[in-house]
């Protein structure tokens, strides 16, 4: 393989890791931010700061859809906004984009919390080198083994 091709491939992989989606970037402290340049202007629309790259990318997609229409290149084309791309002010576009990004962030945070709860629950059950025996609380006690259960077998 040519050395120049290898360097270009390494740069492409690094860029993909740093910017997995169009219109977003990662801050030094780990937050993902989204912004977009307004058409025919030098100014940028700030779309917010998010916990996940997906949330930032969805905010970007919403803004680019309303700015450039349905022919715009989107990160998630299968998730087009339900409304039509009418002419809106920059403030309205920013508001819609931040709402979408915040919703995606909230869903992501809920999933993370649920996964943490599952891990804590499974750690509590796994104790002493094996899983605890789960007891059916709806089952009536067996009178023959009642004395054994009280003594501890």
Curated annotation (Swiss-Prot):
Pfam families per UniProt: AP2 (PF00847)
Record Gene3D superfamilies: AP2/ERF domain (3.30.730.10)
Subcellular location: Nucleus
DNA-binding region positions on the chain: 20-77
GO terms, biological process: defense response to bacterium; ethylene-activated signaling pathway; response to bacterium; response to cold
Gene Ontology cellular component terms for the protein in this record: nucleus
Keywords: Activator, DNA-binding, Ethylene signaling pathway, Nucleus, Transcription, Transcription regulation
Domain of life: Eukaryota
Record bears the keyword Nucleus: yes
SMART domains (alphabetical): AP2 (SM00380)
One GO molecular-function entry: DNA-binding transcription factor activity
Family: Belongs to the AP2/ERF transcription factor family. ERF subfamily.
Summary of the function given for this chain in its UniProt record: Probably acts as a transcriptional activator. Binds to the GCC-box pathogenesis-related promoter element. May be involved in the regulation of gene expression by stress factors and by components of stress signal transduction pathways.
Name of the protein in its database record: Ethylene-responsive transcription factor ERF011
Species name: Arabidopsis thaliana (Mouse-ear cress)
């Amino acid at each position: 393989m040519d050395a120049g091709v290898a360097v270009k491939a390494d740069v492409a992989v690094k860029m993909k890791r740093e910017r997995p989606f169009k219109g977003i970037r990662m801050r030094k402290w780990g937050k993902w931010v989204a912004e977009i340049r307004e058409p025919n202007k030098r100014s940028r629309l700030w779309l917010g700061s998010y916990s996940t790259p997906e949330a930032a990318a969805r905010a970007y997609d919403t803004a680019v859809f309303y700015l450039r229409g349905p022919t715009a290149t989107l990160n998630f084309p299968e998730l087009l906004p339900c409304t039509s791309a009418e002419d809106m002010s920059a403030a309205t576009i920013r508001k819609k984009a931040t709402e979408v990004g915040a919703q995606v962030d909230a869903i992501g945070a809920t999933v993370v919390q649920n996964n943490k709860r599952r891990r804590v629950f499974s750690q509590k059950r796994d104790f002493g080198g094996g899983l605890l025996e789960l007891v059916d609380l709806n089952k009536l006690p067996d009178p023959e083994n009642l004395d054994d259960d009280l003594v501890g077998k």
